């Protein structure tokens, strides 16, 4: 859905790093190198970006109030 603002485990702010992370991946960084460049060293913070599935664009196509 939408990337969480803070890490669920340690509380570090990670919400502002999503777009930068995608930019690193577009410029052919590996996932690990991109996370290192963002300063995410803890496993808990790294998994927040690695495991995120961005579904917001797909959900915007649905209009539950229309029949």
Curated annotation (Swiss-Prot):
Keyword Transcription (UniProt): yes
The protein's role, per its UniProt record: DNA-dependent RNA polymerase catalyzes the transcription of DNA into RNA using the four ribonucleoside triphosphates as substrates. Common component of RNA polymerases I, II and III which synthesize ribosomal RNA precursors, mRNA precursors and many functional non-coding RNAs, and a small RNAs, such as 5S rRNA and tRNAs, respectively. Pol II is the central component of the basal RNA polymerase II transcription machinery. Pols are composed of mobile elements that move relative to each other. In Pol II, RBP10 is part of the core element with the central large cleft.
Pfam families in the record: RNA_pol_N (PF01194)
Family classification: Belongs to the archaeal Rpo10/eukaryotic RPB10 RNA polymerase subunit family.
A single GO BP: transcription by RNA polymerase I
Subcellular location: Nucleus
Quaternary data: Component of the RNA polymerase I (Pol I), RNA polymerase II (Pol II) and RNA polymerase III (Pol III) complexes consisting of at least 13, 12 and 17 subunits, respectively.
Native source species: Caenorhabditis briggsae
UniProt protein name: DNA-directed RNA polymerases I, II, and III subunit RPABC5
């Amino acid at each position: 859905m939408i990337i969480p603002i803070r890490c669920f485990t340690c509380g570090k702010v990670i919400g502002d790093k999503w777009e930068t992370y995608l930019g690193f991946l577009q410029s052919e960084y590996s996932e690990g190198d991109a996370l290192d460049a963002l300063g995410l060293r803890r496993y808990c913070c790294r998994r927040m970006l690695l495991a995120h599935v961005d579904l917001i664009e797909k959900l915007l196509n649905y209009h539950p109030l229309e029949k």
